[in-house]
Amino acid sequence: PAFWQASMTVPVYFDPALIDAGPRPTQKVGESPAQYEERYVDWQTKMGMVDWDALIVNGLIAKDPSLASRRDELSSLYTSSEAYRIRDMVFKDPSLIGKKVEMNFLADANIDVWLADNIDRSLPDDQQQLSPEVRQLSDDLAAKGVIERTFNTQLFTNPDSRSSPATAGLAGAFMGSLFMMLIVIFISIPLGVASAIYL
């Protein structure tokens, strides 16, 4: 990913009608750990089946009602990991259900490359990564300011990603380098100095 990346700020309403898994289970008095675990796993399964993409798509339509007729194309605009991110948020804090939260989502890697003009726009459709409809939609939203190019702070905080190139970062490399330097400073150098003194 580059230092600048396409993203969009979306008002996400955690609609109780869509997140219909019920409240997070708590262990009842007299309930065995196995029974509680069964109920909790069932709740997790229901949460996993929620259409999290619909929350983002609904937020985009709420921000720009003219997008209602292009609903099927909207999920192509953002990276696939964003739906899992809002799912994990609700897992950690179920009180979000029923609330509206302004969230920033990374655009899909192909959208980002298209808007950065790193793809030859004169190529025929069969050589493009995006459909003509999605290309036009991304251009329209960029012109309206719905999709913006912002500084990519996640480049420094995210680990590598095999499934979502747009969210790949350098955090893993930084941590690996840090631990290597700590090993060198606290183990390798003292051992080297001690060996030199001994010899």
Please give the residue ranges for each predicted region:
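Generic hydrophobic, aliphatic-rich segments that mediate packing or membrane embedding
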Residues: 152, 170, 194-195
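Alpha-helical membrane-interface segments at transmembrane helix boundaries
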Residues: 164-179, 183
